[in-house]
């Protein structure tokens, strides 16, 4: 099982944020405890999240770049900007729901096309 952090930069007030998620809730909560992020900031969980954060499409934390560095040092795997979409697609495929599995596979196919397209562009 793995904890992941993506390579994005989203401004939030004076902070720059990215996403942290994991294969299991226990791993995710252990990582935020390790890096000093309060559990109350979890998003997408039906009971642990609060308010509008409960309705996020996947269970994750938005973390500051300083916490990202700590997460990587603690063993989190760095992904590209497609990491969260890839994760949710795989959840859909594993769900046992044929419609979700089909959507998940289409999403993985689209991600593969995007990655290929961007890897072919000169820097």
Predicted regions and their residues:
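Catalytic phosphate/metal-binding cores of nucleic-acid and nucleotide-processing enzymes, i.e., regions
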Residues: 1-122
């Amino acid at each position: 099982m793995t904890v992941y952090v993506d390579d994005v930069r989203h401004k939030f007030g004076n902070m720059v944020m990215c996403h942290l998620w994991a294969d299991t809730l226990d791993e995710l909560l252990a990582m935020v405890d390790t890096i000093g992020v309060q559990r109350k900031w979890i998003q997408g969980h039906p009971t642990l999240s609060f308010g509008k954060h409960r309705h996020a499409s996947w269970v994750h934390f938005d973390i500051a770049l300083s916490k990202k560095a700590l997460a990587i040092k603690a063993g989190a795997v760095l992904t590209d900007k497609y990491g969260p979409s890839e994760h949710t697609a795989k959840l859909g495929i594993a769900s046992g729901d044929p419609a979700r599995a089909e959507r998940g596979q289409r999403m993985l196919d689209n991600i593969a096309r995007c990655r290929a397209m961007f890897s072919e562009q000169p820097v």
